[in-house]
Amino acid sequence: SDYIAMGLLCGLVDRGVKIPEQVEVISTGTSDIDIYQCLRPSLSIVEVPLEKMAYQCARMLHAIINHEVLSEREVNLPFRLCLGNSTLG
């Protein structure tokens, strides 16, 4: 989660670990959390559409519960990579 990645990043920096040279840190979540920009180094994020993902999961689960045939078994949703300074990429 975002908060685990932030805690990990801060803990590594406090212990003198060179980010991203020795360890790279990336999180999944949303880039609208302002604290990401305050972290040093800034955190890289794979932004996933959580609301769309939850909607699709609920829709598919509803179909399964009602013994309906699923129109698809896999749903591809867009993501966005927001590079910070916690990764080399």
Language-model regions, residue ranges each:
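Flexible loop/turn connectors
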Residues: 2-89
